[in-house]
Amino acid sequence: MRRLYLSAALILLLAGLSGLHVWHLNGFTSQLTGLLTQAQQQVRQENWTGAALLTREAKEHWMDHEGYLHTTLHHDDIDAILISMDEVLAFLEGGEKQPAEYAAANARLLTQLELLVEAELPTLTNLL
């Protein structure tokens, strides 16, 4: 009977830690999404420098959590988001200001961040 209680306690601990991970990841990606959305608004106001600063801040925030992210998530997903951040920064810091191309790259990055959280949710689709 003791083994049963220990097994149940371990399962509950793992479920709790998984929930904590999803909660933390959701908060983290929400912060990044907020910064990138603000950057998009800066581009609409033709403040490319402000948008670049906000996007760099989002990238630095991402890099600060890279150890945690590599421990808990798929490496391909993490690398794809980092590449997308670099692409968005290239549009912002490039000599030619291309708002449509920037908007498309930024939208793709925002979608990748959203999908990152969705992939961690304990849904039937993710379990199968």
Question: At which residue positions do the language-model features occur?
Answer:
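Short extracytoplasmic/periplasmic juxtamembrane "stem" segments immediately C-terminal to an N-terminal membrane anchor
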Residues: 33-50
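C-terminal-biased regions
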Residues: 1-34, 38, 56-128
